Amino acid sequence: MTKTKKRGEYPLFLLMEISQNKTFWYNKYMYTKNEDELIALGEKLGHLLEKNDVLILTGELGAGKTTLTKGLAKGLDIHQMIKSPTYTIVREYEGRLPLYHLDVYRIEGDADSIDLDEFLFGSGVTVIEWGHLLGENLPSDYLELEILKRDEGREIVFHAHGQRAIELLKGLTDGV
C-alpha cells in the first residue's frame, strides 16, 4: 500500500472515518525512519497548530514524545531548548503561540493537582504526554499521537477526536 517516496515523505495508511454520537474518530498511521524525520513531522504539524489545539502524546518511555514536541516547537517558531516536563509537570515556551508542554504521568490522573483548564483554554497550544491518563478531563476535541518504537524508526498512530483534530490530521497528510 505504499507508493514510491522521495526522501522525507512518510508512508500513510488510512484506516477509517466514522461518526458516533457527534464525536468524530479519524485514524491514520505514519512511519518515520529516524529522529530527524520525527522532528520534521512535528514541525509540519506545528505549522498547522492554532490557539486551543490540544495534542495527546502516548508511547512508552523513550518512544519520542519529547522529540516530537521539539518539532512542534520549531513549527511554532519557538527557539528555546525543549526539555521533558517529567519532573516539572509543565513547561511553557513562547513563540508564534505559547506552547504548554505537560507530562501528567506523575499526577496519576489527578487533574485537580494542576490547573488543567488554564492550559486547555489558554492562549496557546497544549501538548500532554501520557494524556490518556486524564480520562474524562480531556476536552472533546484533541489529536492523539501514539508513538511506537519500530527498530530505529517510529510508527505514529493518529487518533483524531473531534472536527478540529480531523482538520489538523487532514492538513498534515495532504499530499502524502
Question: Where would I find each of the regions flagged by the language model?
Answer:
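Short phosphate-coordinating micro-motif centered on Lys-Gly-acidic
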Residues: K74, E118-V176
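N-terminal pre-Walker A segment at the start of P-loop NTPase domains
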Residues: N27-G42
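Conserved lysine of the Walker
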Residues: K65
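Conserved nucleotide-sensing/catalytic segment adjacent to the nucleotide-binding pocket
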Residues: E92-H132
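Short beta-strand-centered segment that lines the nucleotide-binding/catalytic pocket of NTP-utilizing
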Residues: I78-Y93
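Walker A (P-loop) phosphate-binding loop of P-loop NTPases
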Residues: G62
